[in-house]
Amino acid sequence: MSPKKDAVSKPTPISVPVSRRSDIPGSLYVDTDMGFSGSPLPMPLDILQGNPIPPFLSKTFDLVDDPTLDPVISWGLTGASFVVWDPLEFARIILPRNFKHNNFSSFVRQLNTYGFRKIDTDKWEFANEAFLRGKKHLLKNIHRRRSPQSNQTCCSSTSQSQGSPTEVGGEIEKLRKERRALMEEMVELQQQSRGTARHVDTVNQRLKAAEQRQKQLLSFLAKLFQNRGFLERLKNFKGKEKGGALGLEKARKKFIKHHQQPQDSPTGGEVVKYEADDWERLLMYDEETENTKGLGGMTSSDPKGKNLMYPSEEEMSKPDYLMSFPSPEGLIKQEETTWSMGFDTTIPSFSNTDAWGNTMDYNDVSEFGFAAETTSDGLPDVCWEQFAAGITETGFNWPTGDDDDNTPMNDP
């Protein structure tokens, strides 16, 4: 061998750690310690330890800490609060860029949910115990407030989970009873509502019927007063009514004066209503009185024929007297003496409301249930019949002639 070859040194072999088998006999595990046991282990980041900082708080801290935004938002004098100097500019530029909205009121509400409070009434200055200048790591101590509803829900769920089965069963039974009572009340209210609806329908139908009758009455009155013949008859009837009322008042006064009793009588001077049993006695008394007056004061001239009711014996002996009939004047005199025969002093007054009060629209017969024939003047015959029947009941015999001097209104 040459000496040069012997002088070349061989490279030192690299020692590689070899895994050793476990010293435990029968163990299948292999010791994988590759010689790195002496190196330090990696530690987690500080941000991962504890509660994470909410993004809203971190963004707000960065905005307040940015010196370029001091004209809009900056720290307070002590560094324990921040001030929004220009809310309009803050809502127009900064909020859309960082919070994706431009509502300053929403930003303030968000601050309130994290416990910030407004410390100055003249400006928008907010403060929190953990929001301090240069101490961003304290933001993890700020927590979001929970709503009262969520707290109540949590408490109720906890109490329910802790309740015994007996209490839960009693609560369920109580809820069932309340539900049953509510259902019964609801059914009762529904029945009342239906009854009220039916009552309202009935009232509406009655109102419609009343309105229909009123319209029919108005239309009948309009047609009635357009009839000239009816208006003329009504005018004549009113004139006769005034005179008749005056005559009836005179007759009533005469009856009261004729039957007035002395003050010492048991009735005390009041007007006595005689019954039918006293008719004959009163009639005989009145005839004697009138005969005495007629015989004493009758003259040879009798223009109105008032002596026909009580003639003398000479006239009664004449044969022509039995064949004659008294004139209307005699009938009127007879009516005056009728008051002394015990009839009731109540005399019906025939005003236009009594004579014409029952007039109806005879064109609509089905509404009132009967029909009546009308005269050529358009006035129902039943009105004139009612008027004539009322006069007949009082005993008056009205003359049919055109001479108004024979009416009882002109009798002195």
UniProtKB/Swiss-Prot annotation:
Residue ranges annotated as coiled coil are 166-224
Q: Which PROSITE patterns match?
A: HSF_DOMAIN (PS00434)
In residue numbers, the region (Disordered) covers: 144-170
Key word Transcription present: yes
Tell me a GO biological process for this protein: regulation of DNA-templated transcription
Keywords from UniProt, A to Z, are: Activator, Coiled coil, DNA-binding, Nucleus, Phosphoprotein, Repeat, Stress response, Transcription, Transcription regulation
Composition-biased stretches (Low complexity): 148-166
Source organism superkingdom? Eukaryota
**Residues annotated as DNA-binding region?**
53-147
User: Additional comments on file?
Assistant: Plants overexpressing HSFA3 show increased thermotolerance.
Supply the domain comment: The hydrophobic-rich region (HR-A/B) corresponds to the oligomerization domain. AHA motifs are transcriptional activator elements.
Purpose: Transcriptional activator that specifically binds DNA sequence 5'-AGAAnnTTCT-3' known as heat shock promoter elements (HSE). Involved in heat stress response. Activated by DREB2A under heat stress.
Q: What is this protein called?
A: Heat stress transcription factor A-3
Q: Which species does this protein come from?
A: Arabidopsis thaliana (Mouse-ear cress)
Its lineage reads: Eukaryota, Viridiplantae, Streptophyta, Embryophyta, Tracheophyta
